[in-house]
From Swiss-Prot:
CDD domains: aeEF2_snRNP_like_IV, EF2_II, EF2_snRNP_III, Elongation_Factor_C. Keywords: Cytoplasm, Elongation factor, GTP-binding, Nucleotide-binding, Protein biosynthesis. This is Elongation factor 2. The gene is fusA. GTP binds at residues 28-35, 94-98, 148-151. It comes from Methanosphaera stadtmanae (strain ATCC 43021 / DSM 3091 / JCM 11832 / MCB-3). Pfam families: EF-G_D2, EFG_C, EFG_III, EFG_IV, GTP_EFTU. Catalyzes the GTP-dependent ribosomal translocation step during translation elongation. During this step, the ribosome changes from the pre-translocational (PRE) to the post-translocational (POST) state as the newly formed A-site-bound peptidyl-tRNA and P-site-bound deacylated tRNA move to the P and E sites, respectively. Catalyzes the coordinated movement of the two tRNA molecules, the mRNA and conformational changes in the ribosome. Belongs to the TRAFAC class translation factor GTPase superfamily. Classic translation factor GTPase family. EF-G/EF-2 subfamily. The modification Diphthamide is found at residue 597. Signal peptide: none annotated. It is found in: Cytoplasm. One of its GO terms (molecular function) is GTPase activity. The keyword GTP-binding applies.
Amino acid sequence: MSRRDQMVKKIKDLMYKPDYIRNIGIVAHIDHGKTTLSDNLLAAAGMISSELAGDQRFLDFDEQEQERGITIDAANVSMVHSYEDNEYLINLIDTPGHVDFGGDVTRAMRAVDGAVVVVCAVEGVMPQTETVLRQALKENVRPVLFINKVDRLINELKLDDAELQNRFVKIIAGVNKLIKNMAPEQYKTEWQVKIEDGTVAFGSAYHNWAINVPEMLKTNITFKDIIQYCNEDNQKELAQKIKIEEVILGMVVEHLPSPKVAQEYRVPKIWSGDIESVEGQGMIATDSTSPLAVMVTDVSIDKHAGEIATGRVYGGSIEKGSEIFFVGSMSKARTQQVGVYMGPERINTDSVPAGNIVAITGARGAIAGETITDADHNIAPFESLEHISEPVVTVAVEAKNTKDLPKLIEVLRQVGKEDPTLRVEINEETGEHLIAGMGELHLEVIIYRINDKGLEVETSEPIVVYRETIAGTATNVEGKSPNKHNRFYIDIEPLSDDLMNAISEGEIPEGRVKGKELAKTFQEHGLDKDEAKKVWDVYKHSIFVNKTRGIQYLDEIKELLMEGFESALDDGPLANEKAMGIKISLMDAKIHEDAVHRGPAQVLPAIRKAVYGAIMLAQPTLMEPMQKVYISVPQDYMGAATREVQNRRGQIVEMGQEGDMSTIESKVPVSEMFGFAGDIRSAAEGRCIWSTENSGFERIPRELQNKIVKEIRERKGLTPEPYGPDHYLG
């Protein structure tokens, strides 16, 4: 039997033993060494040669990733590790650290139970470390810590034993502070990482060695010895004595939970159904004979196999050739193949049981976030995947040859399916195709992928996505239907920050409100008792409240009113951008008794015009997306770096000192960030480290608003000036 066949056989055996499975992700800030670490773990599992590990970038099997040297997608791999006389199946997902690809992290975190957080010993805890850790903890994923690039502290920064330990203590305290702030209440203390219990390891992924306290006790190797090995340039020998894979995978097996342990506390958090039901109990017990429950985390298109859906099996078993049901789209499909991953290749099996990561071919029509169950069964869906950031930059895409237009539409739909953080808008009337992404790099990669599918495209300059809101209030605004037989009266005011945050954090889910289920939550966030029971709709960070009493026929047009409210917010009156942060209350209504006179053609324009008119009466305001920008530069370049930020309308939030480096934390509008990479490099002569994180929307300075509104309207082919309230209400 070849080594590969042995490996396949082991993976197939271990799939059925949930106590011996670990589903883990590796998360970190960009360039802190995630993919290098993954490669080493694979080398150990006999997947790639150990000589090449570190340079191989095995999980980066997309050309773009190898070329840019960063991870763009989350890649899946399964491997077998022996620990204390038992073999374990470790399913590993490598995730991107670049802010533009945060959506992949969110999806990967839904599939795993534990995470190895990699932090660079030189840079310490960085903004993106915080973002990825927050995503992990939000999904109830337990962390352990690996401090990487320790050799650089010794060889480049020349730190001695005591200084090393100080640096480590500081990094660990930083990570634990984040865990304490962001972990679920019951795990704030239990999940803290500690040197003494082995939940923290140190090492160099590039040079293949790592150590933690249990390993020190086993090998008698101390930090003094490590400093000596590094100083004598003898890290190869060190890597033979303290093998990185033994330490990291040992830590994973010892401290991160098996599906059996994790599903008990994770399922209630990520699944919206009744935990006491048959399928609820099946998932909690990781029971492979209970009803099927799969959460799709990723869909990719393979040249040979077509659409491949990757997901986590939480309950039951998914079988080859079986009929399955998509809960979200209410449609059915038949699986062609099911299997697990080994590196980028899939190993097909007859079935994949609960607790595993599955690859399904033939699941046509699946999208990331979909829930799959047996064809003759319907279960409640998994909670939708919350992305921490929203798309903020848009480009228009055109096919170079007109004959390629149908292909362009097809390719855009494919790309949108593969990457749910991308918003693809295909406007068939204007013929405009827009893609909105997380930033400049995200869109560059998507365009490269479109070209890669054999399609030549031209793109516009990147355009920033704005939002509309209000700064004032308006009361008793009347909207009339075209036939004048229906009238609606609304009040409008800005939504409180407290409610906005609750919606952003996912405490209040977006969507039409059924009954009084959220009344208590609305009350906790500032609505009075009566109002809290009357919220009809939460949409794009705005809410629609029905404050009327005893209006005849209102229930019959309730759905139409919500549709009108939603479509008005989809493109606001100021610049046709989406509106947010608005509370609209329906105060009174006069509705025609004859159903013919109160159909969609009458109700929709009436409510839309009322909303538009009210917005224009309540000091309409444009909001722009902001990014936090973190810069670390030598002191001599501090002034130049600060000027670079201030020239872009940036505000300096905080400045600090780390050894001989200065740190600057600032907030800059996304519209001013194009070309920043080149400018900051030349300002600091290449000697700076910088990173960004999306930071929501803020109001545009008054003096710029008219100019920007005019530019947006002209770009969209609208009249240069927005219409006044009378246009909508007259």
